A protein has these predicted regions:
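Bacterial N-terminal signal peptides
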Residues: 8-16
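Immediate N-terminus of the mature polypeptide
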Residues: 2-3, 15-278
Length: 278
């Protein structure tokens, strides 16, 4: 019975404080009540742009009730046990910051550019009501840039054969593909992994670069995939020389027929070695 009464009182308090979400919002400031991203292109999901938001409102259970904020609002200004407890289990109100809003707008626009929408426009609109503010980021994608022609400038034949795929439908870079930074980077990672699997352990995606020609017109891009040579320091320390990438190969294989991994002493024992040339 006591538990039910406590639960009832707590529910009443939560209901009462939920009606005053701006209780701890300083005068002249606004509670960030809602943030929304609207994109005019169905190919770009608004959820993919949320990671670029620099400020988001307080969490709301089921998107309706802000319980953490409600708990925080149950605290008063005095420094006592009750107020400290409610502030600990709750979260303070998110105060609207115009600087963070502008940073979010810029980051969203950069993200759109990376997705191939170089001419995208992003605006941040605000609506104020009763010391609460709603921010809406309106994204106008405009015409995206797409790949027109893709060529591979790989002068090393031992590597160029591993950059192509048997099934052309699996190519990430092909005519009509969005000039998307993430797709371009995925192709670099694919080539690097393929070469690593072939023994080029020192190879990484940084050796793959792109040259893009956007003068084709009609929002088309001619793309060239380039291979950078491998740098090696000169023995005299005066600089570096560039050489071809080389795969690692197995030189010698040794078989220890009576080796016992459980015997610690054997790990440091010199064994007789017989060499065989096949």
């Amino acid at each position: 019975m006591k538990f039910k009464i406590t639960l009832f009182i707590l529910s009443v308090l939560l209901l009462a404080t939920s009606c005053r979400p701006t209780k701890h919002v300083p005068q002249g400031e606004y509670l960030l009540n809602r943030v929304k991203i609207e994109v005019d292109n169905k190919d770009v999901k608004s959820s993919s742009l949320k990671p670029y938001l620099r400020q988001q409102p307080n969490h709301k259970t089921f998107g309706i009730i802000g319980l953490p904020l409600a708990f925080y609002n149950m605290s008063g200004t005095k420094d006592n046990r009750w107020n400290r407890f409610m502030r600990k289990i709750g979260t303070p109100p998110v105060i609207y910051d115009s600087i963070l809003t502008e940073k979010s707008r810029v980051e969203i626009q950069k993200a759109m550019k990376n997705k191939g929408y170089a001419e995208a426009e992003v605006t941040a609109d605000t609506v104020i009501k009763k010391r609460k503010i709603k921010v809406t980021y309106n994204v106008k994608s405009n015409t995206p840039y797409k790949l027109n022609r893709v060529t591979y400038n790989i002068p090393d034949d031992s590597i160029s054969k591993y950059t192509t795929l048997k099934d052309s439908t699996q190519y990430l870079l092909k005519k009509g593909t969005l000039f998307d930074y993430y797709i371009l980077d995925s192709e670099r990672e694919r080539i690097a992994k393929e070469l690593n699997d072939r023994g080029y352990y020192a190879f990484n995606k940084e050796y793959i670069t792109y040259t893009a020609d956007t003068t084709v017109g009609d929002h088309l891009v001619d793309l060239e995939v380039n291979l950078l040579p491998y740098p090696i320091a000169k023995p005299d320390g005066t600089g570096v020389v560039f050489v071809k990438h080389r795969p690692y190969t197995i030189r010698d294989v040794y078989f220890y027929t009576d080796y016992n991994p459980m015997n610690v002493d054997q790990r440091y024992t010199v064994v007789d070695t017989a060499y065989y040339e096949g």
